[in-house]
Each structure stands twice: as structure tokens, then as C-alpha cells.
Amino acid sequence: MKRLWLNAVAALSLAGALGSLTGCGFHLEGRTPLPESMKSTFVQATDMQTDFAQSLRKALLTSGARPPPDKRAASSVVYILRDDVVRRTLSVSAQNKPNEYEITYNVRFSVSSGDKELLAPQDISATRSYSFDETRLLAKEHEEAILRQAMAHDLADRVIRQLSSL
């Protein structure tokens, strides 16, 4: 009897917690739904092969968008105005060799629909640091590439969240 009562209290507490989280707009990371006006969004960039451009296209598809083949058929266009990565040395050893690097992924974008600017140019960036060991050069280059992809994914998610509020 006592055990049944404890299970009921636990279930009600869990239901209350989930209800309050849902009520405040919380949702698990994943698909951010786009409004109908953004379902046909075209991405335009000087280089569509960058980590960010690829991540943004994937994020749009995950959010339910169906990017058209050209921007004339699009309801809106995301212009990637800047997409670059800067690497700088954070610390050096006693032998004046790099011990740690910091990479910053910078993106500038805007959104328009026809002649109407929906979102003025926005600058967003992500920064990560990693240790460097020249005896493990290939592994560290791979680590940097993974960090760049992760930052591009994070930045693309931030753009999608902004698009979902338009």
C-alpha cells in the first residue's frame, strides 16, 4: 500500500515537472520547426562547401524546409555574407612552440524575402580551444576539423532558431 502511494506521488511529480517544462516552451534539442513562410528557404553563399553552409542546409532540411533549386522559387533567402575560421595561438612552451590553439568560427548572414529584408546582417561566432602536440600532428589536425564542424553545427542551429522566430 505504502509502495503504491509512493509510486503514485512519483508519477504525479514527474507529470507536473514535465507539464511545467512544456508550458514554458522547453523542448529537447533536435528539430526546431520553421514557420510556413520559411519552409522554402534558399541558402546563398560564395562557397557552399564550407562546414557552415553544409550544416545550415542540413539544419533546414531537419527543420522541415524544402530548399528550392534556385532562389527565384524561394519564399526567403539566407545570404551567408561571411564564413571564416581564425586560428590563434593561446600558449607556447619554453621552446617557443605552440601548446594550445584557439579557433573562432565567424559567420555573418542576413535574410530577405523578395525585396523585403526580414533580418538585417547579423554576426555570430563560436570559439573553442584545444591543446596541441606536434608529435601527434595528424590527430590534432583531425581534432581541429571536428571542432570546426561542431562549431558550424552550433552556428547553423542558432540561425535556425532565429529563422523560426520570423
Model regions and ranges:
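Sec/Tat-exported extracytoplasmic proteins
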Residues: 60-64, 111-115, 134, 158-166
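C-terminal/domain-edge helix-coil "capping" segments
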Residues: 138-166
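C-terminal motif of bacterial Sec signal peptides marking the signal peptidase cleavage site
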Residues: 19-23
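Bacterial N-terminal signal peptides that target proteins for export
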Residues: 1-11
